[in-house]
UniProtKB/Swiss-Prot annotation:
Quaternary structure and interacting proteins, as annotated: Homodimer.
SUPFAM superfamilies for the chain: Coiled-coil domain of nucleotide exchange factor GrpE, Head domain of nucleotide exchange factor GrpE
Protein name (record): Protein GrpE
Gene Ontology CC terms, in alphabetical order: cytoplasm
Gene label: grpE
Any Gene Ontology biological process: protein folding
Described purpose of this protein according to its UniProt entry: Participates actively in the response to hyperosmotic and heat shock by preventing the aggregation of stress-denatured proteins, in association with DnaK and GrpE. It is the nucleotide exchange factor for DnaK and may function as a thermosensor. Unfolded proteins bind initially to DnaJ; upon interaction with the DnaJ-bound protein, DnaK hydrolyzes its bound ATP, resulting in the formation of a stable complex. GrpE releases ADP from DnaK; ATP binding to DnaK triggers the release of the substrate protein, thus completing the reaction cycle.
Amino acid sequence: MMKHRDKPMPENEEPLQEQEGTLHAEPAEPQPQKEDRVAELEAALTAEKEQSGKLRDEVLRRAAEFENFRKQKEREAVQSSLRAKETILRELLPVLDDVERVLANAPEPEAIPVAAKPFIEGVELMKKNLDRWLEEKGVKPIEAIGLKLDVDFHEAISQIEHPEAEPDTIVEQYQTGYLLGDRVIRHAKVIVSR
C-alpha cells in the first residue's frame, strides 16, 4: 500500500515551491475592471443616498402634515367648545332680560309693600349673581346709549326725531347686547335718532 507521500505527482502539476512563486506575480484581473466596479458601487451609493433623501423628505412632510392636522383639530375643539358655550349663554340671555324687566317695572322702594320687599330683593340678588356669573364666563354687555350706531354691535329697530342727538346716535336701548370675548353673541337692539 502506498502512503500519501509516496503518490506519484501528476504530470500537469508543478511542485509546490514552483506554484508559490507564481502567486506573487501580476494580478490576473486587469485594472479597468476594478475601476468599473468602483464606479458601479459609487453609483449604487449615490442612488441609495437619493432614496434616503427622498424618504427623509417624505417623513418630514408627513410629520408636518400630522402637526398641521393636530393643530387644526385643537382649533376645531376650541371652536366647538366656544360654540357650545355661546349657545348656552345665548339661551340664558332671555332669562336675564326677564329679570331686568321685573326690576325695571318694580315700584319705587318706598311704594313697595313690606311683604313684597323680600321678593324684590331676591330678584335684585338674582340679577347680581347672573351678572357676576356672566362676567366670569367672559360675557360683557355692549355699550349703546349715546354712541353712534355700529352695525357690528347694534341693531336699529326704529328711528325717532331727537332734537339733542346727532343723526344715527343711539338714544334708547330696547334690549341689551352681549359680547363673549370679542365675539357678539347678541346685538343690542336700539332706537336711533334721525
